[in-house]
Amino acid sequence: MSRPPPTGKMPGAPEAVSGDGAGASRQRKLEALIRDPRSPINVESLLDGLNPLVLDLDFPALRKNKNIDNFLNRYEKIVKKIRGLQMKAEDYDVVKVIGRGAFGEVQLVRHKASQKVYAMKLLSKFEMIKRSDSAFFWEERDIMAFANSPWVVQLFCAFQDDKYLYMVMEYMPGGDLVNLMSNYDVPEKWAKFYTAEVVLALDAIHSMGLIHRDVKPDNMLLDKHGHLKLADFGTCMKMDETGMVHCDTAVGTPDYISPEVLKSQGGDGYYGRECDWWSVGVFLFEMLVGDTPFYADSLVGTYSKIMDHKNSLCFPEDAEISKHAKNLICAFLTDREVRLGRNGVEEIKQHPFFKNDQWNWDNIRETAAPVVPELSSDIDSSNFDDIEDDKGDVETFPIPKAFVGNQLPFIGFTYYRENLLLSDSPSCKENDSIQSRKNEESQEIQKKLYTLEEHLSTEIQAKEELEQKCKSVNTRLEKVAKELEEEITLRKNVESTLRQLEREKALLQHKNAEYQRKADHEADKKRNLENDVNSLKDQLEDLKKRNQNSQISTEKVNQLQRQLDETNALLRTESDTAARLRKTQAESSKQIQQLESNNRDLQDKNCLLETAKLKLEKEFINLQSVLESERRDRTHGSEIINDLQGRISGLEEDVKNGKILLAKVELEKRQLQERFTDLEKEKNNMEIDMTYQLKVIQQSLEQEETEHKATKARLADKNKIYESIEEAKSEAMKEMEKKLSEERTLKQKVENLLLEAEKRCSILDCDLKQSQQKINELLKQKDVLNEDVRNLTLKIEQETQKRCLTQNDLKMQTQQVNTLKMSEKQLKQENNHLLEMKMSLEKQNAELRKERQDADGQMKELQDQLEAEQYFSTLYKTQVRELKEECEEKTKLCKELQQKKQELQDERDSLAAQLEITLTKADSEQLARSIAEEQYSDLEKEKIMKELEIKEMMARHKQELTEKDATIASLEETNRTLTSDVANLANEKEELNNKLKEAQEQLSRLKDEEISAAAIKAQFEKQLLTERTLKTQAVNKLAEIMNRKEPVKRGNDTDVRRKEKENRKLHMELKSEREKLTQQMIKYQKELNEMQAQIAEESQIRIELQMTLDSKDSDIEQLRSQLQALHIGLDSSSIGSGPGDTEADDGFPESRLEGWLSLPVRNNTKKFGWVKKYVIVSSKKILFYDSEQDKEQSNPYMVLDIDKLFHVRPVTQTDVYRADAKEIPRIFQILYANEGESKKEQEFPVEPVGEKSNYICHKGHEFIPTLYHFPTNCEACMKPLWHMFKPPPALECRRCHIKCHKDHMDKKEEIIAPCKVYYDISSAKNLLLLANSTEEQQKWVSRLVKKIPKKPPAPDPFARSSPRTSMKIQQNQSIRRPSRQLAPNKPS
């Protein structure tokens, strides 16, 4: 890159160099190269060159090189500054992600500064380098940047950082045509419009010397007006001089790819722009039919159909397509040598399909589009699919150890449509004037937009009101729901409280019972004791009788003993009471002492507080006096402040007035300047206009003069010849003179205008001078006012300083006052607290005094009692002495009595021993009884608790039982209904069998009749043949007779006449026979047609009856299993299945499997659609139902024989490349015999089977050559079988779908296993099914594999195919495989 020479003179250089014209021109050329946005060395490219170099070199391993380190030290900082100044992703707010592809994503963004909405495409540099495809984005950038066509999405700017490339493009809110086709049934009128726009858009691309190569509805976007624009130019390729392209890889989307592009993957890649017209034909077919013309489930099928397009292209009978449309599609979908558009776009435009009254090829973009998108705002993205957030980690370049140059391929990518760098050229000024006009136009448009936005806001308000109403209704509903829930919770709480109360009641009852038991026990004890007492009394009476003599003495002794015991007891109680009183006296004295000490302490504290209070009161008085003085000072200060504020406000008003005057002066100055500039502009414009008009007039005069001279010359030459035209010439001359006079008057007027303009200019000059003088005077006044303002500001500052000082003093004083007030409050609080303490202590003291007085009174009473007790005790002692003396006298008597007593005692001891034995027995029994009773009580308690629990359980069980009873009742009812249904079904089956038999009999009759009719037909045909032969013979005979030469004899005339008569008779007979035969033929043909129609109807009825029979059989099978389960359940008193049920691992019975599966549906969308069907697998059949109602009504949608199953397997991505990647683990495939299928009527035609010559047969396989552009492995050698851009040649079996390298076949390797599928492809069908989960898919596959017969089913040679040979919904659903690149504004 050569640097431009510096502007200054080089030292030592000759002067001639600086003024060299050649050097200046070279500099201008260099400048032009730098300014040119298409130049590889423009300003942005140069800046891009520095930035990636720094990014690629700024690594520790590379910095070890001294040269690199010096370079980085020199340019690192400036490059960072450049990055900060250039546009970056942070300049935009991301609204939503509207598309995601292999290399990045498309975001809907709003520019922060201008608030404009754009679509921003992000391309990962790492992904592009990793996939070695870092060149496709250049075509896309260049086309969008430099196309300048209304048919191409515009690029506003492109920039980059170290991770991504960014392309800020025009946002297309209408979405793509895939979205339009999925939302609308496209009529031919619309298809005509969109095809025309696509043709014009492709013509624009072709005129740029490029071929698109990936034309499809995904890359056709609609703007806000509904008009079409092309996008995704990553596959574009530059044409050579001959308008052709050389390429060895097949590029594009499989459904839209042309045969010549497909052939290019074999190395014959040489084709032209006609490949794009093929794609237009596919697109038109898809719009009119709803699907692509060469659709197949597999990639191989699609490619084979495209290559065999002559045979595989067919139009469905039910599609309403005009002849012109069919003709255009066929003209596009043909060989490239004869394809429409090969000789230019004009032959397409002239096709009769495009003829209409509404638009033509020139004004199509100005006409209203068929569908104008309804947008709620400028960021409305309702026409784009919602894209899930990408939670994956962003991959970046690893840190290199040597120079790699990862950023170098992206140098020069940066582009700005409105480039402001180096924009001081005259062309830029012209651009500015154009821009100003554009701005004015945009302002007008904005006004219209504002009106529309106001209308929109009113609509939105109405919508919000409706939403508020909805919300209010919803809130009411929620309130009602909440109230319901609260009532339910209340009910539950009440029920729980009831249970608790029942528990408590039961416990209380238990306690009551226990107490009753104990009372009973005590009563029993009492009775026992009473009985013992009675027995003892009896014994005592016996003893009394025996010991009458000793009774008196013992009684006396007992009395004395009792008296002694009583006195001793009294003494003990008195001593105890005395001790207690002493203790209480001691404790009360201690308490009194403590209270007295507390009282003293409180009195001391009170004295101290009173002294402190006096001090505080004094301080408070002093502070109040200080406060009053401060207040006086403050009022004085506030008066001073008010005065100062008044002065300041006056000064401020003066300043404001001065500013207003200044502003007025400046305004006048600006107005005058503007007026001056306007006048200058007017003057210049007038001068330019005048000069221009003068030049124009002069030119016209010169022309008129030359013409006049020429006419004169011509007139002079041709006067003799054209004498009659002299008058006309003179009139013309007069007109010319008039024109000249008019031109002269115009010239005079212009001169007058010029003079007036000059006068005005002179007046304006005078005005300008005056205004300048005024401005100078005003400036002087402004300076004076500025000085006054400065003085005033100084004064204001001084006053403000003083004010601040006074305010600070005031603040200090107020703070001191506040602190004093706070301390006063605290002291008051403390004083109040102490007073409260004192009051409480005084109350305690008074209470203690009362207690002490009470205690003293009690002490006196107790002392009196003591004295009385002591006196009594002395009396008792004397009595005891006397009694002792009496006792001593009586001891003698007692001794004698004791001897007797001893004898009695012995007897008594023996009786006591016996009594003790009985008592111990009674005690042990009593203990055992009590223990037993305690255990019983515990058990009873447990029993009550258990009973409660049982009650609760019973309540629950009652509910459960009621529910179970209900279920049992319902089951019984169902059982009854089932039994009745079984009976009915059996009857129905019998009836159906009878009907079947009758139908079969009728069929046999019809067949017999058909056979007889055929025999009759054969007879008639034979008769016809005989008649024809007779006729030919007769004709030949006649020809012979006619060709014979007539003999001369007269006698033969009679023979001739006779033969003529015979001939006429024969002709007559022939005619009559012909008429008879034709009548008979018509009659028998009618009968044949009627019989065939009857047979078709009967066969349809038979199929329907057979399907209903199959469904009934499966229902009977299910009912039988349910009956068995019910019987087992009733026997074992459980509802669950018994041990006898043989169930599979998945919970279903071994013989039966049922659930929801989805079949592929074909409509006009680009995504794989599925329709749910309820599938039942019985022991013999697989039944498909549209819904559970159809199942109940025994109306199956399709029935398959299990005996006719060939193969069941899970699919791979290559088998269903159109399906979503998430759905593939849930899809499986069933292969079955054609005759084992019963279905409802066909809506779509059966796809034609390809020719067998295209298949390579090997080991039972039927291989189809193909290529894989997405991850696939060879099933023979397990090596990769794919590549993104140059995949190896591959083979795929159309029977078992095994995939392998083509080299294995070419080298005749024995790696390839033989084909596992043994069936005739012409008599077999495949069916794709989608399960709800991968587990369900595995379950279905495993269970169906078990049901496949070991021997493959032999095809029935006599089986007739049903007239209803397909389902309502076709199996082969159109799934669009995404293109290689990411399209703008939409998911790719």
Swiss-Prot record:
<feature type="modified residue" description="Phosphoserine">
    <location>
        <position position="1137"/>
    </location>
</feature>
<feature type="modified residue" description="Phosphoserine">
    <location>
        <position position="1362"/>
    </location>
</feature>
<protein>
    <recommendedName>
        <fullName>Rho-associated protein kinase 2</fullName>
        <ecNumber>2.7.11.1</ecNumber>
    </recommendedName>
</protein>
<feature type="region of interest" description="Interaction with NPM1">
    <location>
        <begin position="373"/>
        <end position="420"/>
    </location>
</feature>
<dbReference type="GO" id="GO:0004674">
    <property type="term" value="F:protein serine/threonine kinase activity"/>
</dbReference>
<dbReference type="GO" id="GO:0072518">
    <property type="term" value="F:Rho-dependent protein serine/threonine kinase activity"/>
</dbReference>
<dbReference type="GO" id="GO:0048511">
    <property type="term" value="P:rhythmic process"/>
</dbReference>
<feature type="modified residue" description="Phosphotyrosine; by SRC">
    <location>
        <position position="722"/>
    </location>
</feature>
<dbReference type="GO" id="GO:0007266">
    <property type="term" value="P:Rho protein signal transduction"/>
</dbReference>
<comment type="subunit">
    <text>Homodimer. Interacts with IRS1. Interacts with RAF1. Interacts with RHOA (activated by GTP). Interacts with RHOB and RHOC. Interacts with PPP1R12A. Interacts with EP300. Interacts with CHORDC1. Interacts with BRCA2. Interacts with NPM1; this interaction enhances ROCK2 activity. Interacts with SORL1. Interacts with PJVK.</text>
</comment>
<feature type="compositionally biased region" description="Polar residues">
    <location>
        <begin position="1362"/>
        <end position="1376"/>
    </location>
</feature>
<keyword id="KW-0862">Zinc</keyword>
<dbReference type="GO" id="GO:0010825">
    <property type="term" value="P:positive regulation of centrosome duplication"/>
</dbReference>
<dbReference type="InterPro" id="IPR020684">
    <property type="entry name" value="ROCK1/ROCK2"/>
</dbReference>
<dbReference type="GO" id="GO:0005524">
    <property type="term" value="F:ATP binding"/>
</dbReference>
<dbReference type="Pfam" id="PF25346">
    <property type="entry name" value="PH_MRCK"/>
</dbReference>
<feature type="region of interest" description="Interaction with PPP1R12A">
    <location>
        <begin position="363"/>
        <end position="784"/>
    </location>
</feature>
<keyword id="KW-0808">Transferase</keyword>
<feature type="region of interest" description="Disordered">
    <location>
        <begin position="512"/>
        <end position="532"/>
    </location>
</feature>
<feature type="compositionally biased region" description="Basic and acidic residues">
    <location>
        <begin position="512"/>
        <end position="530"/>
    </location>
</feature>
<keyword id="KW-0175">Coiled coil</keyword>
<dbReference type="GO" id="GO:0005813">
    <property type="term" value="C:centrosome"/>
</dbReference>
<keyword id="KW-0547">Nucleotide-binding</keyword>
<feature type="modified residue" description="Phosphoserine">
    <location>
        <position position="1374"/>
    </location>
</feature>
<dbReference type="InterPro" id="IPR029878">
    <property type="entry name" value="ROCK2_cat"/>
</dbReference>
<dbReference type="GO" id="GO:0106310">
    <property type="term" value="F:protein serine kinase activity"/>
</dbReference>
<dbReference type="GO" id="GO:0006939">
    <property type="term" value="P:smooth muscle contraction"/>
</dbReference>
<feature type="binding site">
    <location>
        <begin position="98"/>
        <end position="106"/>
    </location>
    <ligand>
        <name>ATP</name>
    </ligand>
</feature>
<feature type="region of interest" description="Disordered">
    <location>
        <begin position="1345"/>
        <end position="1388"/>
    </location>
</feature>
<dbReference type="GO" id="GO:0030866">
    <property type="term" value="P:cortical actin cytoskeleton organization"/>
</dbReference>
<dbReference type="GO" id="GO:0005737">
    <property type="term" value="C:cytoplasm"/>
</dbReference>
<dbReference type="InterPro" id="IPR011072">
    <property type="entry name" value="HR1_rho-bd"/>
</dbReference>
<dbReference type="GO" id="GO:0005886">
    <property type="term" value="C:plasma membrane"/>
</dbReference>
<keyword id="KW-0090">Biological rhythms</keyword>
<feature type="coiled-coil region">
    <location>
        <begin position="1053"/>
        <end position="1131"/>
    </location>
</feature>
<dbReference type="GO" id="GO:0031032">
    <property type="term" value="P:actomyosin structure organization"/>
</dbReference>
<dbReference type="GO" id="GO:0032956">
    <property type="term" value="P:regulation of actin cytoskeleton organization"/>
</dbReference>
<feature type="site" description="Cleavage; by granzyme B">
    <location>
        <begin position="1131"/>
        <end position="1132"/>
    </location>
</feature>
<dbReference type="InterPro" id="IPR000961">
    <property type="entry name" value="AGC-kinase_C"/>
</dbReference>
<dbReference type="GO" id="GO:0042752">
    <property type="term" value="P:regulation of circadian rhythm"/>
</dbReference>
<dbReference type="GO" id="GO:0005829">
    <property type="term" value="C:cytosol"/>
</dbReference>
<keyword id="KW-0963">Cytoplasm</keyword>
